[in-house]
Design a protein with these regions (language model features):
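Active-site region of the double-stranded beta-helix
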Residues: 13-118, 134-140, 145-178
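Conserved SET/PR-domain catalytic core that frames the SAM/AdoMet-binding pocket
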Residues: 117-129
Length: 178
């Protein structure tokens, strides 16, 4: 019997997902300005806001989002956020490091959030839009698993943005509902 090494490796404590079939996407501030309430000229266009590492095999996706501890005029760093194109596809998020929120929005555009920290596990119903918010002072890492046929519907969130923003003022979090 032949014993093979894994094709993909995830250093849970200090690293990212690595392997020949792993894709990496980097979101810079220049491409994320519309995610925030206002543009912050003090944030460089080249500032890395977050990186997503993903691996897909036989209909299942495995990913890691690494978010930087950046605020935009006090607005905590967020991911783009999306609904799934196939609303019957659910997703799992697991906190791997740092701290933040999983912001969820239903189809009537009402929001609620769950605290995410190392070790927390979050089930996301396919009918909920979801985005991550880094509320801490360190990198925020979240592992995710979803079916590859889920798709990402970013336009729906662009047309009907999340109705909640999380700000940091003097180290304290402030939630603003729009």
């Amino acid at each position: 019997m032949e014993i093979k090494d894994a094709k993909v490796f995830h250093d849970y404590l200090n690293g990212v997902i690595e392997g020949e079939d792993v894709k990496k996407s980097t979101k810079l501030y220049s491409n994320a300005k519309t995610f925030y309430k206002s543009v912050d000229p003090s944030v460089s266009d080249d500032q890395i806001m977050y990186e997503v590492y993903s691996y897909e095999h036989d209909g299942l996706c495995y990913g890691l989002t690494v978010m930087q501890p950046v605020c935009v005029n006090g607005d905590c760093n967020v991911t783009r956020g999306h609904f799934h194109e196939n609303l019957d596809c659910d997703e799992i998020y697991c906190g791997m490091g740092g701290e933040g929120l999983l912001l969820l929005m239903d189809e009537d555009y009402h929001c609620h959030a769950e605290k995410v920290k190392c070790g927390s596990v979050h089930y996301i119903d396919g009918h909920l839009a979801h985005r991550l918010v880094n509320t801490g002072n360190t990198e925020f890492k979240v592992q995710c698993m979803w079916p590859s046929h889920a798709g990402h519907d970013y336009k729906r969130v662009e047309d009907h943005p999340f109705t909640v923003r999380v700000f940091k003022e003097n180290g304290e979090l402030k939630v603003e509902e729009e």
